[in-house]
A protein has these predicted regions:
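Context-gated lysine
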Residues: 15, 31, 37, 57, ...
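Signature of long, low-cysteine stretches enriched in small and polar/charged residues
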Residues: 31, 62-116, 120-129, 133
């Protein structure tokens, strides 16, 4: 990969070999902790193939139209990196079999005549569901949600009328990331923060 395509990523990611069927000029990385494992790939794309920078609503609407039953939208954001490059990203969660959750990041960063596509897959590893259960029990004890129907626990972050698939739950709010730093969603958001602040 030539220098202009390089994106600074956290140093705890290990470089991996790419496969022949991977996109041209791609680089792959992996990372594993006690609670998550990650596979990440970066490669250049044409700017016209990038998500629309600055237009979060178009991305949200597109994802809502494409989600499968076992998936849910967690986050869509756009902005400018420290080095004044436009970026936009989405995080979608997907149910793993037999248990656990995968958080899929798609992030585009505008370079000049092209964009970099970052695709990462952070999976729950070890004991799954710990974050959800801990926060759910806390909220039940505080009277914020009530069994058995758990009204308000599951909610699309951008459209409360959207009910399809596996909706985001309250434990996935960013405010709980610090309590579960090795959870795959926390790892995903920390990765995004690093990329925005170091590119």
């Amino acid at each position: 990969m030539n220098n202009e395509l390089l994106i600074n990523i956290p140093t705890d990611f290990q470089k991996m070999n790419t496969l022949p069927e991977d996109p041209a000029n791609s680089v792959a990385y992996g990372k594993q902790t006690q609670s998550s494992k990650c596979f990440l790939m970066m490669f250049p794309i044409n700017n016209q193939n990038a998500m629309p920078y600055g237009n979060e609503k178009a991305v949200i609407d597109g994802i809502h139209g494409a989600l499968a039953d076992g998936q849910g939208l967690v986050e869509v954001k756009s902005g400018i990196t420290k080095n004044q490059k436009r970026y936009i990203y989405s995080i979608v969660k997907s149910k793993l079999e037999p248990s656990g959750m995968q958080y899929i990041l798609t992030m585009h960063i505008e370079m000049n005549d092209h964009s970099i596509n970052i695709q990462s897959y952070f999976d729950e590893a070890g004991m799954t569901g710990f974050r959800d259960t801990s926060i759910m029990n806390k909220m039940i004890n505080e009277g914020k949600i009530t069994p058995p129907n758990m009204d308000g626990w599951f909610k699309d972050p951008y459209d409360e009328n959207y009910k399809k698939g596996l909706l985001m739950n309250l434990s996935e709010n960013v405010e709980y990331d610090a309590m579960f730093p090795q959870h795959p969603l926390s790892e995903t958001r920390n990765f995004i923060k690093y990329v925005v602040e170091n590119n």
